[in-house]
Curated annotation (Swiss-Prot):
SMART domains, per the entry: RNA_pol_Rpb6 (SM01409)
Gene: rpoZ
Protein name, per record: DNA-directed RNA polymerase subunit omega
GO BP terms: DNA-templated transcription
EC number: 2.7.7.6
Keywords associated with the record: DNA-directed RNA polymerase, Nucleotidyltransferase, Transcription, Transferase
């Protein structure tokens, strides 16, 4: 990201540490399937979700502490998805053992 965006992001929080925590939480939300608030043409053309989270915060469409998505709900969804993946792997292994 450009330095001007970093300065803007730092002005939105009380410290660079809080900014890093907020950015990391938003990146985890995106990884868990949260929709991006950016229009398609403004989305980052990279898989780096931290960069995308920083861009979202820099646009002002998300504000620290108020409009970030429900973290607990997305964490629960992520845990459910992961458990389903593990169960599918176990079932596949059991099927191979039967053959």
């Amino acid at each position: 990201m450009a330095e001007k965006d970093i300065d803007k992001l730092l002005s939105m929080t009380d410290s660079k540490y809080r900014l890093s925590v907020v950015t990391a939480k938003r990146a985890l939300q995106l990884r868990s399937g949260a929709p991006s608030v950016l229009p398609v043409e403004q989305r980052v053309r990279t898989r780096n979700l931290v960069t995308q989270a920083m861009r979202e915060l820099a646009t002002g469409k998300l504000t620290v502490g108020t409009s970030l998505l429900d973290e607990q709900r997305f964490h629960q969804d992520y845990v459910r998805q992961r458990q389903a993946q593990i169960q599918a792997q176990l079932n596949a292994e059991r099927e191979r053992e039967r053959d």
